[in-house]
UniProtKB/Swiss-Prot annotation:
GO terms for cellular component: cytosol. The lineage of its organism: Bacteria, Bacillati, Bacillota, Bacilli, Lactobacillales. Homodimer. Heterotetramer of two MnmE and two MnmG subunits. This is tRNA uridine 5-carboxymethylaminomethyl modification enzyme MnmG. Belongs to the MnmG family. Its cofactor is FAD. It comes from the Bacteria. NAD(+) binds at residues 276-290. It is found in: Cytoplasm. NAD-binding protein involved in the addition of a carboxymethylaminomethyl (cmnm) group at the wobble position (U34) of certain tRNAs, forming tRNA-cmnm(5)s(2)U34. Pfam families: GIDA, GIDA_C_1st, SAM_GIDA_C. It comes from Streptococcus pyogenes serotype M18 (strain MGAS8232). The gene is mnmG. FAD binds at G15, A16, G17, H18, A19, G20, I127, S182, Q373. Keywords: Cytoplasm, FAD, Flavoprotein, NAD, tRNA processing.
Amino acid sequence: MTHEFTESYDVIVIGAGHAGVEASLATSRMGCKTLLATINLDMLAFMPCNPSIGGSAKGIVVREIDALGGEMSKNIDKTYIQMKMLNTGKGPAVRALRAQADKSLYAREMKHTVEKQANLTLRQTMIDDILVEDGRVVGVLTATGQKFAAKAVVVTTGTALRGEIILGELKYSSGPNNSLASVTLADNLKKLGLEIGRFKTGTPPRVKASSINYDQTEIQPGDDKPNHFSFMSKDADYLKDQIPCWLTYTNQTSHDIINQNLYRAPMFSGIVKGVGPRYCPSIEDKIVRFADKERHQLFLEPEGRDTEEVYVQGLSTSLPEDVQKDLIHSIKGLEKAEMMRTGYAIEYDIVLPHQLRATLETKLISGLFTAGQTNGTSGYEEAAGQGLIAGINAALKVQGKPELILKRSDAYIGVMIDDLVTKGTLEPYRLLTSRAEYRLILRHDNADMRLTEIGRDIGLVDDERWKAFEIKKNQFDNELKRLNSIKLKPVKATNDRVQELGFKPLTDAMTAKEFMRRPEIDYATAVSFVGPAAEDLDAKIIELLETEIKYEGYIRKALDQVAKMKRMEEKRIPANIDWDAIDSIATEARQKFKKINPETIGQASRISGVNPADISILMIYLEGNGKAHRKY
């Protein structure tokens, strides 16, 4: 079929949420003429649910986005109202930043960034169809009948894809926050042959700040110590006038109200059909599943500096409006609270992610990429990370360059994408530190060391950032080398000082680096014995040195595991392999291999239901050039 195109682009991104913004900025910055199409320009980078960025594992993803040259990190550093480092009492592997955002300012700042970006056209329009010829993308069709040509298309439609809002017995077609739903595109994605799933998520009510009795709640302030998501942000710019959050709880009265109205809850009446998020359940779901709990935490989170709206985190619900009011008034501090917006549930279509390659390109259609909640994830950060990778790979494909695949040992983004394309997901996927087997090397403090060179190679890290990174890396490397070269000897003068500080004396000579491995010895103590570095070191470099030195043994073990897995990842599986020709593998393994079509032995080994014996047979088959274990 010959199409008459009115406009032509290298890449078209459908949807301007957190995934779409990162995808379009990446493609345009890599030199591709890009169109970012959105149903509503006023909702670009909008936060329809929680007004925050970061959190456990998620905060590390934002740092990874920054190291690769993405935008979310810089934007939240410009627009937060509170910053907090989580899990400071635990090990470095699980520490992560979380920021409360001024949600309106966040969206405005990101829109301004997109508007001034070269090579990027921003357009309010509804995309109804993906145009495909001979198994590859050639463009898109708008609701008004316009056809735009494209060499690659990235679908980042979020919860708008056949979205339906549910509130009590009310159910109607809608995207998030009462925006338009994308129904025709959902129909046409299915017609293209993609397998579609149905998920559900929800949001809590918002209450008016001036109607809250804060004296009945517990204050939750931000941190005084400067922290940032972007490695380029300066401590001098750290916000001093932060806005606190507040903590309160549900109680038995709250639980009674919910239990008495379960028959009216869409979650239990059968109105909700989609699968909801395990790690962010509705309050009615929590009350039923954890009936033994006397109370549940609720955080009152301001939505911005210039608004009265307060987000009641932990109270996600689709109960009828009258029940929501009663529920709110049962909570300490909210007895007279004015509900400004009701909570609601939203159901939406997803593209089942086992149909994707690790580049986030669909296996079915060349040049068609998907990212974000479209792939079955939850969260702004997960969406932004996928959007960045999808955008990068769309640009690389258009330019005929090698693709970028982040491994599980490279980044949490790599863990997430590998989980999605290898295991799929039966519920909205959320990143957790427990999902990463190499979390000690995927830390908050070393994201730039892991990924900045990759960002530079693909063209997203500019000269200023690259110079700053080189300076930091050289300072780190030089100081590590110095600490490993200076010896402390167990002489009287040294041991007298050691014992004065309350530490065990030295029995053997050791390097300053070995001295620092002692749990009680920090960098400042070590250099008091061996002298300072040639130049003043930033506190973040010192933190990195302490972590790398104190956990060196564990880090080395993790790197050994990475090297072992790398050998399996390098063993490619032919795309046209005949799984039925391999004798002796288990039926379940054969079915999973056919469904997912893994690209490497490493990926095959991570598929649920596949055991080591199946992998051994597969490797023997491949090593025999397809002759061993072939059926005749």
